[in-house]
């Protein structure tokens, strides 16, 4: 096991391209994206009641080495400040498995 940073971002789908571009610019190339996210926060509740996918919320989860967390914040913060959204970064432990289950 080794320490990594877990990055979670919720934003409008419209900003997804900018967020992904920022992550990849820093070298965070492994991430998952979940579309049509409903949530509730200090600004109220956001439901997935739109037929237009450009107005949906997305959830991006990525993991990176601890040294990349600060550059991620510097790139993501202006996007979220301008267009809205939330970002959380936490410390987690990664377990790397190099053993193929099929060979067991």
Where on the chain are the PLM-derived regions?
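Positively charged, small/polar-rich N-terminal and surface patches that mediate targeting and assembly
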Residues: 1-104
